[in-house]
Structures are given as structure tokens and as C-alpha cells.
């Protein structure tokens, strides 16, 4: 029994000595293990991760490892890692990104999952918090209040811009007067639509010819005719038109009569007069006073004596006047055929 007990005691002592040696070795050289683990935990070339997106247990282990590394002041590798920590922090600060978990409302992102131009989506199918990093310094997604932060690499320089959310857009009334005032030629003063002038030319359907009463007859005994005219005006315009402007409409020519004109009966200046002394006394008076005129002496009508030809300039302007009156006559016929439209 004694030799067996001694053998068990000797084996127990050997096992305790090996454990003590291992613990002393780990205590004398803790930097190598910590540095090896720290090198695995830092990746400067990969995408930066937000602290919110990491596991709390991993965060505690990293802080514990950093604490052990910083307490060892005599190790060269620990010194190098301590000097590299500020550089790593500066590198992480230059990346303009934020965690998805920092958003208080998940409805700010578009329903279809699309992002703005210049934004890289690193979301995965896991349930962990998602981190979004922007590839530019001025592009970012809007938050719930419609604000985004630019130039976030410097904490002292922060730019906030107010933006309207898409849901706050209102429908613009295109027919409103204020909207019409904003639409104008660049460089000009905005002004509303001009109001209709009271003195402007009325529309064609509002114009109609109004003829005045007939004037007295004018006898032309030598030509055996008589004529009368009447003035006219266009309804809607002030003033009257020239009397001879519309010859076909406002000038009437008829054969002269002795009742209306003081023409010479002996010369038969009104040969087409059918009312030659309708009463019996007039016929007897005519028969007793004048003898019948031979047929070969009757001229219908008696032409005036030939006069010298007018000057070429006068003839030219006469033709111009006749042409203008013809044009006016054609226009006036359109007005007379068009029925006036009365506005209520």
C-alpha cells in the first residue's frame, strides 16, 4: 500500500508542476498571445464596421485585449500597436457612414429597397444591424426630419441642409395667378396675363354693318339718271365710313323722273320716265305747248360734249380708287351676309 500511495502522490506532484509551469509561461509572455489576437481583430483594408453592428461580447473582448496590451509598456509589439491605434481611429473617422440601427424609423428608406446614387448597401440577409457606407462626402440618405449630414470626417465642420420629405409635396395649381406670374422669360419682370382692352378691335362676329337712312336724290339730267346714297358704320366702332366706300350697297342709281328732277321735258332728258303727265290736263298742256319731236332727233340719253382727255396721273389714281372700292365692296358683302351674334 505504501509504494502505491507514494506513486500516486508523485504523479499528483508532477501534474501540479506542469500546470504551474504553463501558467508561469503564459504570465511571463502575455503580449504575444494578445498581439496575435489583436492582429486578427483589426482589418484596416476591409470595410469599417459600426460599433452598433458588432456583438457586445466581442466588443468586451476587444476592450479587454487592448487593456492588456496597453498595460505592457516594455514590449515592442505592444508599443507599435499603441501607436497604430490613433491612425486606425483617424482612418475610421474618414469613412462617412452610419449604422442602420441609428435610424429611429425604418420607413425612411424607399419601400422598394433602392438607394440614392453614390451609396453602397452592405445589408445582408442576417438579422444583425445593417451598416450603410457612402462613397462620397456629400451624398447621404435623409433622416426622419428631412436632414442629412455632410463632411462628417471633421467633427468641427458639420453641414446640415433642410430638405422636404417626398410626402410633403403639394399639388401645384397651374391655373392660379401666382403660378402664372412665376412663369416668364428669364430676366423679365413677372406680370399677370394682360386684361382685355376696352378700345381694342372687337372680334369679327361682333362686327356688323349698320346703314343710315337714304339721302336726297341727285339728278343727272344729261345722262338720264338719278342717284342717292346713304352713310353707314360698323357696329362696335366709333365714327362713320366714307359715303362712296360701298357703292354697290349704299348707292342707288335709277332712271330720272320729271317728278323728282327738274329736267327739260322738251329734250327728253328723262326718256325712261313712265309717268309722263299721268293726269289729263298735263297731256293737253304738253300737246298744246310743244310739238312732237321727230324720232330721229330723240337721243337716249344725250351724251355730253366731248371733253379733253384727263392727264395720265389723274386716270391712274382713278383706277386705284375704283380698285380699292371693289375690294371694300367684297369685304362688306361678307359682313352683310353674316348675321350678328348677340351676347347675353
Curated annotation (Swiss-Prot):
GO cellular component assignments:
extracellular region
Entry annotated with the keyword Signal: yes
Q: Where is the composition biased (Polar residues)?
A: 162-182
Q: Where is this region: Disordered?
A: 162-197
- Where mainly located? secreted
Print the keywords alphabetically. Phosphoprotein, Secreted, Signal
Where is the protein localized?
A: Secreted
Taxonomically, the superkingdom here is: Eukaryota
Its post-translational modification remark reads: Phosphorylation sites are present in the extracellular medium.
Tell me the GO BP annotations in alphabetical order: regulation of cell population proliferation
Matching entries from InterPro entries are given as:
MENT
A Pfam match is PMSI1
Q: Which residues form the signal peptide?
A: 1-22
Which residue windows are transmembrane per the record? none
Q: Which PANTHER family match?
A: PROTEIN MENT (PTHR16240:SF2)
Reported function: Involved in control of cellular proliferation. Onconcogenic modifier contributing to the tumor suppressor function of DNMT3B.
User: What is the name attached to this protein's record?
Assistant: Protein MENT
Organism from which the protein derives:
Rattus norvegicus (Rat)
Query: Which lineage is the organism of this entry classified under, starting from the top rank?
Result: Eukaryota, Metazoa, Chordata, Craniata, Vertebrata
Amino acid at each position: 500500500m505504501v509504494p502505491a500511495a507514494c506513486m500516486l502522490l508523485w504523479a499528483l506532484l508532477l501534474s501540479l508542476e506542469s500546470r504551474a509551469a504553463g501558467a508561469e509561461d503564459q504570465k511571463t509572455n502575455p503580449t504575444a498571445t494578445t498581439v496575435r489576437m489583436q492582429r486578427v481583430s483589426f482589418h484596416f483594408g476591409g470595410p469599417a464596421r459600426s460599433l452598433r453592428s458588432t456583438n457586445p461580447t466581442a466588443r468586451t473582448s476587444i476592450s479587454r485585449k487592448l487593456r492588456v496590451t496597453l498595460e505592457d509598456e516594455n514590449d515592442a509589439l505592444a508599443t507599435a500597436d499603441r501607436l497604430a491605434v490613433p491612425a486606425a481611429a483617424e482612418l475610421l473617422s474618414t469613412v462617412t457612414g452610419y449604422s442602420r440601427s441609428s435610424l429611429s424609423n425604418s420607413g425612411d428608406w424607399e419601400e422598394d429597397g433602392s438607394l440614392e446614387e453614390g451609396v453602397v448597401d452592405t445589408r445582408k440577409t442576417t438579422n444583425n444591424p445593417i451598416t450603410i457606407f457612402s462613397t462620397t462626402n456629400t451624398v447621404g440618405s435623409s433622416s426622419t426630419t428631412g436632414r442629412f449630414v455632410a463632411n462628417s470626417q471633421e467633427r468641427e465642420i458639420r453641414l446640415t441642409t433642410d430638405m422636404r420629405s417626398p410626402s410633403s409635396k403639394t399639388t401645384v395649381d397651374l391655373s392660379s395667378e401666382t403660378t402664372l406670374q412665376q412663369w416668364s422669360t428669364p430676366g423679365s419682370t413677372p406680370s399677370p396675363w394682360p386684361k382685355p382692352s376696352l378700345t381694342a378691335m372687337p372680334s369679327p362676329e361682333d362686327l356688323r354693318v349698320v346703314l343710315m337712312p337714304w339721302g336726297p336724290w341727285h339728278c343727272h339730267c344729261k345722262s338720264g339718271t338719278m342717284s342717292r346714297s346713304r352713310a353707314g358704320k360698323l357696329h362696335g366702332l366709333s365714327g362713320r365710313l366714307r359715303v362712296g366706300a360701298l357703292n354697290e350697297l349704299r348707292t342707288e342709281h335709277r332712271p330720272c323722273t320729271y317728278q323728282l328732277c327738274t329736267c327739260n321735258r322738251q329734250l327728253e332728258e328723262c326718256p325712261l320716265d313712265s309717268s309722263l303727265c299721268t293726269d289729263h290736263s298735263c297731256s293737253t298742256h304738253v300737246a298744246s305747248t310743244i310739238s312732237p319731236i321727230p324720232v330721229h332727233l330723240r337721243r337716249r340719253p344725250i351724251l355730253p360734249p366731248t371733253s379733253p382727255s384727263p392727264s395720265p396721273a389723274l386716270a391712274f389714281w382713278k383706277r386705284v380708287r375704283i380698285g380699292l372700292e371693289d375690294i371694300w365692296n367684297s369685304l362688306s358683302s361678307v359682313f352683310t351676309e353674316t348675321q350678328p351674334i348677340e351676347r347675353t
